[in-house]
Amino acid sequence: MGKVILITGASRGIGLQLVKTVIEEDDECIVYGVARTEAGLQSLQREYGADKFVYRVLDITDRSRMEALVEEIRQKHGKLDGIVANAGMLEPVKSISQSNSEHDIKQWERLFDVNFFSIVSLVALCLPLLKSSPFVGNIVFVSSGASVKPYNGWSAYGCSKAALNHFAMDIASEEPSDKVRAVCIAPGVVDTQMQKDIRETLGPQGMTPKALERFTQLYKTSSLLDPKVPAAVLAQLVLKGIPDSLNGQYLRYNDERLGPVQG
């Protein structure tokens, strides 16, 4: 039986490219893709077929529907070989001093539900299936450079990704490394819809002009990464396995320690 991989945020950007890379790297695997919008998921299924790519349109914070998906995977395959937790959101982009209303706190809560609590729930649900893999069950979290350094207006996002980094360490501490491993990867500044939103709406609304200028210049100088670049690293980790030496670690996509998996 081929590997069974679950990818969240699979309808666009890094997630969509990751589905393609995983299937093309391992033609025996089955990928389950989850996202809130269907168009990108449909295009992937048309390209690769329903036997290779199975998708569900849902919000990852909807625990009952995620439970149903995990149960479906259990009944059909009896195992799960890897997860890439890619789904995430950036909003609210706003300074801490301006985040002083009940609505602001609700936005923080929504972001943490998507970027962190839904992932905690998913991992807890999937651990038995990951441990049933004949290989090591690999959990790859898409983190961010904002988890380890401040970005103007990104406090909610950065805090949620920092929590994710710590969660990976906790998994590595609690679970036997011959059964389950976890790693956090910062994908770099990638040419995705999120970057467009930063340049056109979120950044002008919530960042200082100086802070926003970096992202604008990366775009103007064609320095944004193609999604294929981080997707290749994520695919290798979830398919070939997280090295034991990197279990629980946070790394940038181009960290030299990833050499063995960058291929």
UniProtKB/Swiss-Prot annotation:
Reactions catalysed, as given in the entry: (S)-benzoin + NADP(+) = benzil + NADPH + H(+); 2-hydroxy-1-phenyl-1-propanone + NADP(+) = 1-phenyl-1,2-propanedione + NADPH + H(+)
Entry EC no(s): 1.1.1.320
Name of the protein in its database record: Benzil reductase ((S)-benzoin forming) IRC24
Gene expressing this chain: IRC24
Keywords for the protein's UniProt record, in alphabetical order: NADP, Oxidoreductase
Lineage, uppermost ranks: Eukaryota, Fungi, Dikarya, Ascomycota, Saccharomycotina
InterPro entries: NAD(P)-bd_dom_sf (IPR036291), Sc_DH/Rdtase_CS (IPR020904), SDR_fam (IPR002347)
Catalytic residues in the record: S143, Y157, K161
Recorded phenotype for the gene knockout or disruption: Displays increased levels of spontaneous RAD52 foci in proliferating diploid cells.
Positions contributing to NADP(+) binding: I7, N86, Y157, K161, V190, T192
